[in-house]
């Protein structure tokens, strides 16, 4: 298969209005894979007022903050990672604090930086962000997207927002059935390996041949499922 030609990077903002026009304000099922403290959860709840937003966060520090802050009944929070297996797996916890106002950072991250943890071992991330430490691992619950969705979202998935720190390949490989009934997806990508096994954007598109690029940003991509018939 010949690699698809990638469009140029667009320096635009993915706004609520853009997503509503594309996905539809009447979207009913939204997945947020990598929810952190819930900032994007709030945005998704606002953007899609009729949707149930299913959010996944395996880091217990971030999960606790999300659980405390997000009270909307349409928000469903799961303390597990979406990955390439069903069961438990090693999760690499991030730590440290980035450059910036120390007092404010300590208030926001009292237990350390909880935003870069991954099922994938950090590689280039260590050199690119030397302040971010990975000194410990924990065991977390993991489900493949197909396994989770077969029980909790068996119909159309309107939109997936994925921030998986290098595990996007596992999402695509072990979520093919769920992705076949997913209309739109927004996810991070990196063309330099920051985590072990992290796919480039070109490789990610090879794993998801039905999806085309709507907007390519410097580190994120908005995708449309061209084969979706629902």
Predicted regions and their residues:
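Phosphate/nucleotide-binding beta-alpha loop and adjacent structural elements of enzyme active sites
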Residues: 1-230
């Amino acid at each position: 298969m010949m690699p698809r030609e990638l469009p140029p990077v667009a320096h635009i903002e993915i706004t609520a209005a853009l997503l509503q026009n594309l996905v539809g304000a009447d979207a009913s099922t939204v997945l947020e894979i990598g929810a952190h403290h819930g900032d994007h959860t709030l945005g998704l709840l606002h953007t899609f007022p009729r949707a149930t937003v299913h959010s996944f966060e395996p880091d217990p520090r971030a999960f606790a903050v999300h659980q405390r802050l997000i009270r909307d009944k349409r928000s469903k929070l799961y303390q597990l990672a979406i990955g390439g297996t069903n069961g438990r797996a090693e999760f690499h916890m991030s730590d440290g604090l980035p450059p910036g106002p120390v007092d404010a950072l300590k208030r926001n991250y009292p237990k350390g930086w909880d935003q870069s943890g991954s099922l994938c071992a950090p590689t280039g991330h260590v050199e690119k962000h030397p302040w971010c430490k990975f000194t410990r691992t924990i065991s977390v619950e993991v489900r493949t997207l197909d396994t989770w969705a077969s029980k909790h979202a068996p119909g159309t998935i309107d939109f997936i927002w994925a921030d998986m720190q290098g595990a996007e390949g596992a999402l695509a490989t072990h979520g093919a059935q769920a992705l076949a009934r997913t209309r739109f997806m927004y996810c991070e990508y990196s063309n330099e390996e920051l985590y072990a096994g992290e796919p480039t954007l070109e490789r990610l598109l090879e794993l998801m041949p039905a999806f085309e690029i709507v907007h390519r940003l410097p580190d994120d991509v908005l995708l449309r499922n061209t084969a979706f018939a629902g």
